[in-house]
Amino acid sequence: WDQQIENTAQPLERGSAAATLARLQADRLVTEVRVDAEAFDAGERSALTALVDDRLLTRRDDRVRFEHDLYGDWVRLRVLRSQAESGRLVEFLEGRMDSPVWYRAVRLYGLHLLEHDGLASWREAFAAFGDLGDAADLARDLLLEASAHTVGSARALSALWPVLVE
């Protein structure tokens, strides 16, 4: 993120353009998004050109996509972290859990919580996801899957055992 977004001439525009693209891909269940004034503002459209030049994105005609799916997942993780920081993660995910594209981002979010923020943060997210209605079980399952992929997964699973048997 630092190299491709933050340490550039247009960090805000590049970050916003990448986040908008990642969100639109997942929300619309598409791999490419048409670059137009409805989807991207003028600053974002300019930043998209720079992201294509830096090979983070690929352009075909009037559409853009991430060079690799992992870039999109990585940016969607950033979107989720931003929503969590503002206290709107559950609200943000409410209408989005029917899109499988968000699943990897939720799993990565769980992984991020376990590896960077600790078990308490993971437990808070797990509890908060209970408010997602019909999607609560799915969101919680994705967080649980993250625990199996973390460094020291046996230790993480042992620490999470009380939550798992509730």
Question: Which functions belong to the PLM regions below?
Answer:
Residues 27-165:
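C-terminal leucine-rich, beta-strand-based interaction scaffolds used for sensing/assembly
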